[in-house]
Amino acid sequence: GFAIWFGFVPLIHIWLNQTKKESARLTFLSAIISNTIAFYWIGLNSGASFIPVFLSLTGAVLYLSFLLAIFGWIISWFEIKRRGIALIIIPFLWVTMEWLRSFGPLGFPWANLAITQTKFLPIIQIIDFTGSEGIGFWIMILNTYIYYLIINNSVNKKIITLFIIFIIPWIYGTLRIDQLNDKEWEFRTVAAIQPNINPNQKWEPTYRKTLISIMDSLNNEAYNMKPKLVLWPEAALPVYMRVSSIKQVYEKKVYESNIPLIMGTVDFKRDKVDRKVFNGSIYFGLNENKIYHKLLLVPFAEYIPLSEKFSFLKQLNFGQANFSHGSEFTTFPLDSIYFSNIICYESSHPSIARGFINNGARFLTIQANDAWLQNSSGVRQHFELARLRAIEFRTGIIRSANTGISGIIDPTGLIKHKVNFSDQEVFQGDVLLNKGLTFYASFGNLFSQLCFVLILLQGAFILISKK
């Protein structure tokens, strides 16, 4: 929200006036508090036992807080080495930190500051150029300039400059939204299902017939709307749909109606060594079926990091699923175009959406199951991430959650339809097609990379000049 526009001012004071060690320590303590508040919902996972859930929450909070402590240490180092420079480099180093934090098996761009600004739609329009890190850059410029005005006792003299810094993204974003709204957009009409099924009950053998009956009833309702595509949520039925006998029911439905269907399903492959299981989706197309295997898995929930290289790690039991990673940015044919499907946690990583868009997807579907998180802020955060992806790639998105928040989002990030947590609903709407590659789709995190290079050059300059 708006508090973050000035909320870093006390920390900036610490970074610029404490030793490196004390700066890191105080940053770590403050980050423990803020990260616990932001991500407490990790500890609400009803799909696992208490110990692994508690360890997941603790590990995530400590990891994110440690990274911020390093940030505080580096800022203090710059200030000690060359007084006055640290205040200038804070926005650039923040972008660098957010970008580097997205890499590796523990990458977590979910924590980027952009997610705090989705209520202010004009502000976040710049991310089709900068990526979500651009919002963190603007927030840090605001905070550093406010701090500068306070310590120099010049708030009254330079308030106009502060106002200009504040208002620029609002003006740009408002004009950009108006420009996009004036354009003619192609679209495809898609129907989606939010069945609101208890995920623990879903896998009980005694509930299987009831579940199939519920899903078939909702599916018939969706087909009666005569869309171009029907979307089901993640892991919709407790079967390996690709090899299940009930697959024929849905193939027949697609054939008779001439309307494709995409549903979440688990899948498997056998090779000479072992049997690999995937979280994925199956597309019942008009000419063929097609499978997508989830590329980005949730660490310690869907797999153990590095377990695909070191198989003995799979013997560890934290209640995780031991899925394998997919390997292809799959696109699905829909009349004359292609679209792609993102599964749950993947929507937090722009690199996944970018891979699909660059592979020819004209719009994105998202399948999710947020029931594990109960009705927490994590559910709402997860939906807001989809709005960021829509803006970054100027593409329409439709989201189907088992329960959570389902909906339709347009290329400006505007929510066109929304289904609340615990509601059961079948809905239909027009999903807008992207008009081509945005700057961010074409060049990726160029802005973040430039910030990283500037930090390296400044650090190198200080080290060389001291010698």
Where are these regions (language model features)?
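Membrane-embedded alpha-helical bundles of multi-pass enzymes
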Residues: 1-177, 375, 386-389, 401-403, ...
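Soluble catalytic domains of enzymes that build or remodel membrane lipids, polysaccharides, and related
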Residues: 178-443
